[in-house]
Amino acid sequence: MSFTDTKTVFGSLDSYVKGGIEVIDDDRRHYAFSNVFEVASLAKPYEKVVVGKNLRYVIETLRAEGTSDWFTASHDESVIVMDGSVEIDLVKLDDPERIAPAHIEGSIRLEAPPQGRRMGLMKLRRGHQALLPKGAAYRFRSTDGVGVLVLQTIHGPHSVEKWSEICLT
Amino acid sequence: MVGDLSDVRAMEQDFPSTRNESGYQRFRLGDFVFSRDEYFVHIEWRAQGKKLSHTMSADVFLRALMRDVAWNFFYGWVNFDDVFGTRNRYDRVELYAGRYHPVYKEQGLDHSACFDSSFVMQAFRSMLDDWTNVGYDPFAAPAETGLTWQGKKQGHNRAALNRARESCRRMPGLPGDVPLRTDRNRYPINRAFLDVPQDEPVIEAEPGFEHEVHAFNLFAYLSRSDVTWNPSVTSVCKHSLFCPTTEEYILPVKHANDRIEWFLQLSDQIEWRIEDRATGRPRASVVMRAGDVAAMPADIRHQGFSRRRSMLLVWENADPRLPQLYEDGILPPSLAGEFQEPGSVK
Ligand SMILES: [Fe+2]
């Protein structure tokens, strides 16, 4: 048996084809259907647009353009590069509790450059997933034009929800 | 792991000469009796003093059974088809026939019974072990495993059945966590993903931070998955689990959620048939392409169709309190309530 269609189709900002919902007896809003490339194409740089929400847990889509602010969290987060190339700087905060105490969830923006030891640098391309370890400060730097990130985190003060704008209705 | 032999024997004793003319063992769990022959699996139960029977193609049944076992009965309901399935009650498992089929239900011909999860697991593993012939891999796409599921009993395929589900603690590739997939640990790139770049991220960790500065090539990891429709966990944020998986052909079960779950399509396309959870009435058809994100409401059952092997990120909230909160109506079954009129501020 031959399967000649050997090309794997990933999406990108320049090339994505959104799917859709054929309603039989339903309401499209039940599916909160969006597309991360479309969301990123309409977002401000590093705006944390919530595309998935399960109680307090969220998936955020970020438009990676230029260099982001520094963020940290009281818990692990993770990021997947869906398009582009991104570098991540990591700093072990001397006093992480001061910025993100254990009872505060979600990514917290640092008001000043991080105080602590440099942990390292990660260079990511499409399809790569990185750990954003708890207690570390991180920032993203897009190194090849505009990229798209997907962040696994918890709803926080900088999370932006605009379901009516991003979803099929 | 194939179930401990003492339990298999216990079941054999229920039916002293249990091997039928096709060579397969018969199994009984409470009032449910399971048997297979060359092509089919037969499930029998009693309701209203009548004997009821339901027949499924053996490959469909075995593929569903494999997922039910591998997923440890998963979240909520695993419908093998419109009639038979299991409901996870998290330490107990309910087996049902006709319970979520409007006609069986209406006629009072449905049946369900609860068992200890470990007992059902043992029995299902024994069933899988006995009913899977040499050469048949219920995790593989049909084109990869052929028609060896057919015919009289012939041997075993324990290597295929005993794959461990890969669940990371923090992220694959970290010291002490699940290893990355390579040719060397026998995860070759799947035939459908030969074009997926295999470059790993460049990591420059300062001394002392090697165990925490970590990233890996998720798409390459998935390109080497040797199973279909079997999520593995690749990142954890408290109860939030990223469970990516590779999908080809048809999801062997109709999964019904006891909570909302989310999909992020990473590559290619899957079409989801969505039905009402309790009745199976069609609700919608959802087509997801690379980059699409969608919620699967907590009151549906869904089955996916993937024309070519695709990468799907299943996102789960593993909070054990959720089933009760949805059941009690404290949480709404979908996010529809989050939608605001355009321009309003949240
Ligand atoms: Fe599901």
Over which residues does each language-model region extend?
Chain A
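Tight coil/turn sites that cap or link beta-strands
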Residues: 62-66, 126-127, 133-135, 145
